[in-house]
Swiss-Prot record:
One family name in Pfam for this protein: GatC
Catalyzed chemical reaction(s): L-glutamyl-tRNA(Gln) + L-glutamine + ATP + H2O = L-glutaminyl-tRNA(Gln) + L-glutamate + ADP + phosphate + H(+); L-aspartyl-tRNA(Asn) + L-glutamine + ATP + H2O = L-asparaginyl-tRNA(Asn) + L-glutamate + ADP + phosphate + 2 H(+)
Summary of the function given for this chain in its UniProt record: Allows the formation of correctly charged Asn-tRNA(Asn) or Gln-tRNA(Gln) through the transamidation of misacylated Asp-tRNA(Asn) or Glu-tRNA(Gln) in organisms which lack either or both of asparaginyl-tRNA or glutaminyl-tRNA synthetases. The reaction takes place in the presence of glutamine and ATP through an activated phospho-Asp-tRNA(Asn) or phospho-Glu-tRNA(Gln).
Protein name listed in UniProt: Aspartyl/glutamyl-tRNA(Asn/Gln) amidotransferase subunit C
HAMAP family (alphabetical): GatC
Molecular function (Gene Ontology), one example: ATP binding
Superkingdom classification of source: Bacteria
Gene3D superfamilies: Glu-tRNAGln amidotransferase C subunit, N-terminal domain (1.10.20.60)
Family per record: Belongs to the GatC family.
Entry keyword set: ATP-binding, Ligase, Nucleotide-binding, Protein biosynthesis
SUPFAM superfamilies: Glu-tRNAGln amidotransferase C subunit
PANTHER family xref list: GLUTAMYL-TRNA(GLN) AMIDOTRANSFERASE SUBUNIT C, MITOCHONDRIAL (PTHR15004:SF0)
Length: 99
């Protein structure tokens, strides 16, 4: 799929870009190069290849490295609320700011 100069002008217009003729021709070369790479990737036969979420999983077993969901700190609510001006039911009370 090769783009034409008219395609680049239309894309620039949709993106609200003002490009000079030189910029349009440079962009045309870059975009056609990009689409060339995409076409080469599409041409590769991937039948029977399992999708990877990381290339590393092709060469070694990658498991999710998550820590155990365990409590690591003690409850210090009362100690934290000692310096608060107003507390009720374990919650900080703040002045009403909207009437």
């Amino acid at each position: 799929m090769a783009l034409t100069p008219a395609d680049v002008s239309r894309i620039a217009n949709l993106a609200r870009l003002e490009l000079s003729t030189a910029e349009q021709s440079d962009l045309l070369v870059q975009l056609n190069g990009f689409f060339g790479i995409v076409e080469r990737m599409r041409a590769v036969d991937t039948t029977g290849v399992a999708p990877l979420y990381t290339p590393l999983s092709a060469v070694q077993d990658v498991s999710l490295r998550l820590r155990d969901d365990a409590v690591t700190e003690t409850d210090q609510r009362e100690a934290n609320q000692k310096s608060a001006p107003a507390v009720e039911g374990g919650l900080f009370l703040v002045p009403r700011v909207i009437e």
